[in-house]
């Protein structure tokens, strides 16, 4: 066993261009999974590390495990969330496809820590390589664990990975999210207390169990410790998934992906539930959840989307809004009618076909829709839309008044 390179932890090991890491290679590289006599020790280590959930919400992992462990006794269920329905993210599928045993390690540790007798691996069915790799890894590990383990392919859809949607799907076959109590941690799969954790969070828990919280905190900048998986897309010569120290600036991440500030007009951070930022505001900003929040931006699931200077931000936002409208769970008016209306209005502005009142309507809907839906889907969409109106405000006005795009010079945005 050897300690991973400081800058490469989750993705340390064989190249990410071949087959999944085999169990024997995984054990040779990292050693056997520790079996602590007191599983609360692991929870304390997770708390001391400061590890945050990597599925988007950013809740402290150790605190989440402790809350469940203190009120269950062998009756809980662990759900490994690998649905990854966010189009701009690829980190989870990469981790599952190439480091499946690290994910299984984390799931086993979580089950032992919270007193679970069942582990469900919930993997997006469209991620075929991840489904295959996780299926093989689970089969290889069944004999060593006391928990029942099963793989369930999640339906294709943006909301399918939301906690309540995942639990509803596992219980009834309907991936429908809700904000209605009880929480899944109280009444989840089979009506039992359920720990639902993102695959990256679990993989990191497996490393912390081996190397300790001090090791985890030995890298990172400012007050942020550890590393994170980031998906970079857009104006990048080398787009894809990379592992970086928390606190690394957006500009440094972009440089590693092969681009420079003059090639980038704006940055979308955190994905389709995230926020747009002007390149001048984002470039020196550290990838730090607290710092980003203080600037009104989102870390989310680690997405850095670089909008090229030749692309229209209005049109790109319209495409995202149209997608979010089609991904509605169809259970409330703000989502079904509100997102559809705002998507259509944004598209008319982008296409140079606005009738004169679209911008006012969009601004009004952005303020009215949040908090009124049956789940958080419309809230996330409106957060992105609100940031687009701020970052691309002048371009929205230009489109609406002239019917043309100042970026492409075309009528609307054709490119």
Where would I find each of the regions flagged by the language model?
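Histidine-anchored nucleotide/phosphate-binding helix
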Residues: 99-113
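Short loop-to-beta-strand transition segments
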Residues: 64, 119, 259-272
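Gly-rich Lys/Arg/Thr-decorated short loops/hinges at beta-loop-alpha junctions or inter-strand turns
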Residues: 22-29, 80-92, 186-188, 231-236
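Conserved phosphate/anionic-ligand binding catalytic regions in large, soluble enzymes, centered on
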Residues: 47-68, 156-168, 325-337, 373-385
């Amino acid at each position: 066993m050897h300690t991973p390179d400081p800058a490469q932890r989750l993705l340390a090991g064989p190249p990410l261009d071949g087959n999944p890491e085999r169990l024997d290679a995984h054990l040779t590289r990292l050693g056997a999974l520790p079996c602590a006599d007191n599983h609360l020790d692991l929870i304390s280590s997770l708390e001391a590390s400061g590890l945050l959930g990597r599925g988007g919400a950013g809740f402290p992992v150790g605190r989440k495990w402790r809350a469940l462990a203190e009120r269950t006794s062998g009756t809980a269920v662990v759900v490994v969330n690998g649905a990854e329905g966010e189009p701009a993210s690829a980190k989870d599928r990469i981790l599952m496809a190439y480091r499946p045993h690290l994910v299984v390690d984390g799931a086993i540790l979580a089950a032992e820590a919270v007193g679970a007798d069942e582990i469900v691996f919930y993997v997006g069915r469209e991620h075929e390589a991840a489904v295959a790799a996780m299926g093989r890894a689970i089969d290889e590990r069944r004999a060593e664990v006391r928990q029942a383990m099963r793989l369930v392919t999640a339906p294709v859809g943006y909301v399918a990975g939301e906690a309540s949607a995942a639990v509803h799907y596992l219980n009834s076959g309907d991936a429908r999210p809700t904000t209605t109590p009880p929480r899944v941690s109280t009444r989840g799969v089979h009506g039992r207390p359920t720990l639902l954790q993102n695959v990256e969070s679990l993989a990191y828990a497996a490393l912390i169990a081996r190397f300790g919280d001090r090791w985890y905190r030995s890298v990172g900048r400012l007050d942020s410790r550890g590393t994170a998986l980031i998906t970079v897309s857009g104006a990048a010569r080398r787009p894809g998934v990379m592992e970086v120290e928390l606190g690394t600036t957006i500009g440094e991440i972009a440089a590693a992906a092969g681009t420079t500030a003059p090639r980038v007009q704006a940055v979308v951070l955190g994905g389709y539930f995230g926020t747009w930022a002007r390149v001048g505001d984002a470039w020196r900003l550290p990838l730090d959840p607290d710092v980003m929040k203080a600037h009104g931006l989102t870390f989310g699931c680690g997405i850095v989307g670089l909008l090229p200077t030749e692309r229209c931000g209005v049109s790109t936002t319209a495409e995202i809004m149209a997608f979010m409208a089609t991904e509605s769970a169809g259970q409330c008016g703000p989502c079904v009618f509100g997102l559809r209306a705002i998507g259509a209005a944004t598209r008319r502005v982008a296409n140079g076909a606005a009738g004169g009142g679209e911008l006012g309507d969009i601004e009004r809907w952005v303020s009215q829709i949040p908090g009124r839906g049956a789940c958080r889907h419309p809230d996330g969409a409106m957060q992105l839309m609100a940031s687009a109106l701020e970052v691309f405000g002048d371009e929205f006005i230009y489109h609406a008044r002239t019917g043309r795009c100042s970026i492409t010079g075309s009528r609307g945005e054709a490119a």
